[in-house]
């Protein structure tokens, strides 16, 4: 399928603001009661020449929750990473909720480039879009067949794989000020392969022995916060 959906007014508004050229149409349910949101959506559709339909049956057929009253229909698109900027790299991510949360966190702290090493979830899945609260549409992202392919295209940068066997605790890490970097995180279930210990400077987020690991979205958020503060 070459198109996808935004479910809800806020993600739909973010789509219209940031990627209007890819929007096919917007559907509104007659039960939508936020006049302010309707006016924003209507204004953006008019501004960009996007069809706006008030079609309750179409919304009800597409939505996965009864409290969804706005649906954006958009064509999937591709873009490229900025080699001079900092990147988040996710190796084989499999959870759509985590992906959306990571995107939202990354955009919130100013990292706007995401590399996904295949296989990985589709960033355009409506569950990812919703978990990102529409911040996906501010993101540069690219899928790569392998980490080696990513490195070939990423430009000169420092690499920081986050691993349980990381050599340096995050809170003790010494970095060059102003460096361009990539923060690398593994799959939710398996983490990064041991071979990533040889890629740049491996890092570990220390925690108590009462748990075996951190949730991927949480670990990524901690790493992003430490590197951007």
Q: What is each residue range found by the language model?
A:
Residues 69-79:
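Short, structured interface segments
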Residues 162-212:
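Active-site/ligand-binding-proximal alpha/beta "capping" segment
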Residues 28, 80-166:
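RNA substrate-binding interface of SAM-dependent RNA methyltransferases
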Residues 1-71, 156:
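N-terminal positively charged helical leader segments and presequences
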Residues 6, 51-56, 139-149, 203:
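Short acidic-hydrophobic, aromatic-tinged amphipathic segments that line or gate anion-handling sites
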Residues 55-56, 91, 117-118, 140, ...:
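Short beta->alpha connector loops at strand-helix junctions that form conserved
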Residues 72, 107-109, 123-137, 194-229:
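Structured adenosyl-cofactor binding patch, chiefly the S-adenosyl-L-methionine
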Residues 8, 94-102, 213-219:
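Amphipathic alpha-helical repeat scaffolds
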């Amino acid at each position: 399928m070459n198109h996808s959906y935004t479910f809800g007014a806020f993600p739909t508004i973010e789509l219209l603001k940031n990627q209007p050229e890819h929007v096919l149409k917007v559907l509104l349910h007659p039960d939508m009661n936020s006049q302010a949101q309707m006016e924003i959506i209507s204004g953006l559709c008019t501004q960009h020449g996007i069809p706006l339909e008030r079609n309750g049956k179409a919304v009800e057929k597409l939505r996965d929750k009864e409290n969804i009253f706005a649906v954006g229909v958009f064509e999937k698109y591709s873009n490229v990473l900025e080699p001079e900027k900092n990147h988040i790299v996710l190796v084989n991510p499999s959870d759509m909720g985590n992906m959306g949360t990571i995107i939202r966190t990354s955009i919130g702290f100013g990292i706007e480039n995401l590399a996904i090493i295949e296989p990985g979830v589709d960033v355009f899945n409506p569950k990812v879009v919703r978990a990102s609260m529409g911040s996906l549409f501010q993101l540069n992202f690219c899928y790569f067949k392998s980490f080696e392919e990513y490195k070939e295209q990423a430009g000169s940068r420092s690499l920081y794989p986050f691993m349980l066997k990381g050599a340096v605790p995050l809170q003790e890490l010494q970095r060059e000020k102003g460096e361009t970097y990539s923060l690398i995180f593994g799959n939710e279930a398996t983490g990064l392969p041991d071979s990533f210990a040889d890629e740049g400077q491996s890092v570990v987020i220390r925690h108590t022995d009462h748990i075996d690991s951190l949730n991927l979205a949480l670990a990524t958020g901690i790493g992003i916060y430490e590197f951007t503060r």
